[in-house]
Design a protein with these regions (language model features):
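Alpha-helical linker/edge segments of TPR/alpha-solenoid repeat scaffolds
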Residues: 80-84, 108-119
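Structural marker of alpha-solenoid helical repeat scaffolds
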Residues: 24, 58, 92-96
């Protein structure tokens, strides 16, 4: 664990509890997502990104991931990666027949720019 991670764990009882749950269920996408969101709230974008990418690697069908991953990439000034996250999420949402998520992802991608900007 890095010094920053240890400091954040000490300053965030919620993060400490989530990490304890996660140690018992390391592949649980909901817990991974909750930890990522907690790191985001603590302004540790790199740790948040690492957890989002862990979800994508372990549970790529977790549709809730892609909108937040894309938004984080936007925050990190990585629009190409944001575009790719939204596009991948749209495919996952289509397969899951999740029209609400599909609409949110399509809207986020549209707000990012035109397809010609990213393909």
């Amino acid at each position: 664990l890095s010094f920053l991670t240890i400091h954040l764990l000490m300053s965030s009882p919620r993060l400490e509890k989530l990490q304890a749950f996660l140690s018992a269920s390391p592949d649980d996408p909901f817990l991974l997502f909750a930890v990522a969101k907690e790191y985001e709230s603590l302004k540790d974008t790199q740790e948040a990104l690492a957890y989002y990418l862990a979800i994508r690697a372990k549970q790529p069908a977790y549709v809730g991931l892609y909108y937040h991953l894309g938004k984080l990439y936007e925050q990190l000034s990585q629009p190409q990666q944001a575009w790719e996250a939204y596009t991948a999420g749209m495919e996952v949402a289509k397969l899951a027949r999740d029209q609400h998520a599909l609409g949110e992802l399509a809207g986020a991608r549209l707000n990012l720019g035109d397809e010609e900007d990213f393909t």
